[in-house]
């Protein structure tokens, strides 16, 4: 009863004070009720000193009302609060919510939802239980929510790379929400968090202690996160200490719910306990109350500036609850955005601060709470160490599961970066590391160490070892930046940190050597390394003789002095002695039209093949020479391709690289002998310098003045030319060369390593961690994890294989195979040359002339055709019309022939024109001049062109002698005209004079001796109409000089026919000629008679001349002209000499063109006579040559044309002139215009 009177009397006094204020003053004041959740000394002192004089700096007058609630009975609390709201016009309530007042906070939240009165909690004790708050409640909290606390706790775990942890909770309200928040944060993070275990224990009074002990002993996590109340936390830590989970080897993190008051932590709390509180955790109760009242006052002031009046006081609890009035809703919105004394008090719709400032605190060794981190605007700033693991002298506490690791920055093994400026943390794949600051540590200084982020090859190895061996670690950078060296008896660097037990382990680019192994223990090497040398590329210039650099001088001499000359002489000698080429007429080699393949042309041919030039050359004809030329062409392809492939490497701007063979190279051992002196150095206080100092003292003495402070400085010196070579660990140099911008730095020998060793992890002497670390490293090596890490960290875009492609000359050894090929080809050519002569001079005469060996003849002809080709007879079909638009002699002759064909309808002339046209077209396409048949006479008394002579028309021969018109003689005997065949010429049977000539008869027939031929006059020839040829032999082309109808070789232009097919062939050719077109004479133009008029017309039949003889075996078969004799078409030479008649406008006189065009007519056409003509009766040496040739006991049929390849010398025209020939020879074929082209 007495307990209930106290609050009633207090309420009565408050109401009396409110009544005495007066109406006028109360309209401008804001009434704020301050409710204390306990009645301790601090609360009592604050209540007595809390007056309106404490809030004079606020924009509105404040009337504070203090209420103490120390009764946990909900009904009494509701009665007290509702009485206050009903008696006084209260604008808001400030509530001091400790961790023991969760029930009062819940009741106030209910009252706010009914009366819409703003309630502001200032201590944060009710933050956990009011998640979420009641609908319509205006309860605001200066504390942080459980979700915000979890975010900071996970940031602490991330800061120290504590990815594996366990969660232990009690049955306190909110534990399910806590577990849900842990899983949500772990799943949303990019880090691979590992929740090892989750335990829910009954930690209240009378709970099962044995079960709690058993479950705690099963936990195997170095980091534990707990959720419970203050009283439950005392029980939990007491049980955990008995289970061995409390100590330096374990880390505990709890939210502020488990702390309660931070004034006096319980004795069961372990040293190093980490928690998260608000930034007001060190503020006094009076300061907290002042902040709460200021938020309400500033919200009311903002409301009055907008609406001109203060917001209405809160309603009564007895009134019927209804919707929130617009004025109360507007006042609540003004309270959500308030700034006071530079701090942002913006609240979320849930009633919590949007951007709270939190503090990470830890229990130190003096049993005091110490701030070790700060969370501000999403960034965590931590102090190292996070818990007091060090004494005042920074000596570490012995810990069986936590290691202090020292390292040294050196790319790519340890790379140090600054934290993310936006979040203040480290990005993924990095580990927080620290570097000790130079200033003295003080309690107010939060940064005795500089926070950094470390990554790299060694950092990844450390993270994998921590997971496998299961340990936690602190990572810090050594202050002197050295690996470790003994200076005046004191070790520095990472070796000194481990040796003096300031660190449990050291990892980095730490080389294992004998001196270090005496004082510390090393693990198995995880990276193979040694000593290597790095140099820089320097730009050079292209030498003027760079185009000669692909081959050595010996190769050039061998190529052009020896090979080219020897092969050229070889080809010429083979061609010279070849039985089918040069050897056929050595005495005529220098005459016009004869063989002209000389040694100069042989050299020119081989030179053109070497450089693949399109120049005019003359190819050899011998088979052996052609084989040699083909082999030389293959040699030239290889030679030129090798030269071209290597030329680019020498023609570009060469880059000079200092090449050294090793540490024993003369450039290192005698650097002063170089000009300028060779400059090289290393980073001191390392294993590289120790190795050089121990083995090469003179070298070490020279390099001391060129030593560099760090690897980066050395690389800069190399690029700037201050250093010629840098000696250091091979693994580091290979990485730097691969990552160098521009790929200017290279390691010699593609990363050649000297004094091979490895990198290891340094541990204290006789450390119990050594065996576990070694086994873990061997497992990583066996699984290929280290190879994967090397691929990620130790490889670069500039590979040494590409950087050190150095050009070298091709020596004799490189080109020996090509020269060997030439030697073998020359040997094989000699064998082919000997076999060719053996077959030509010996074996071919031993083959019997038998019809059973016809297949050998066919086989021989086939092989011969493959190498030399056989001129095939053109088809009897009409060839395509030639191009008559060209301004050339050939085009003019073709035009003339076509015009002649259109003017006449004589079948014989028409067919002759057809054959001439096709022959000219064939020779024009093949670009080949047919060989002549026989020599033609020259006129002894030449006259002017176009003038008639007594002898009639002369033959179209005689070189430069123009044709002379002679008087025709009456015909004596008609000659049989054979069927005209295309591309084949035949002579008419002639009579010879009765003159006798001395003859030398051989085994193949009568021949004229050389002396007798020389005795003949130059113009001593048979009559022109008795010869087969139209020009002298001296002007023929250089074809072989063979007798008439040579035997045994078969003529080139004769196709092989059996004896039974000769007559069939002749009939078939006659039929083909008969089917040719024959224009009628009616279509003849009237100007033809004037163009081709002669004084002595020819008889209307195809006849020979006076010496023509009728063959007994053949009847004369002559064809008559279809038109009058006055319109007779003249012969080809007559047409050329006659001139242009009047009335023919298109006729262009080109006398010199015609004369030169018919000087090399190689064929004659006529019936083959089996008896000599009458004119040969006086020349018995011609009888043997007049017989038709017999091929393999076969006599060729009639009407066959042959090439005149006899050995007749020039005979004067007067020899047969005595017989008196009535008329000149009729020329039926124009064979060649090659001289004109």
UniProtKB/Swiss-Prot annotation:
InterPro entries: ANF_lig-bd_rcpt, Glu/Gly-bd, Iono_Glu_rcpt_met, Ionotropic_Glu_rcpt, Iontro_rcpt_C, NMDAR2_C, Peripla_BP_I. Residues 20-554, 645-813 are extracellular. Changing residue 815 to V: Increased NMDA glutamate receptor activity characterized by increased glutamate and glycine potency. The chain crosses the membrane at residues 555-575, 623-644, 814-833. Belongs to the glutamate-gated ion channel (TC 1.A.10.1) family. NR2C/GRIN2C subfamily. A hydrophobic region that gives rise to the prediction of a transmembrane span does not cross the membrane, but is part of a discontinuously helical region that dips into the membrane and is probably part of the pore and of the selectivity filter. This is Glutamate receptor ionotropic, NMDA 2C. It comes from Rattus norvegicus (Rat).
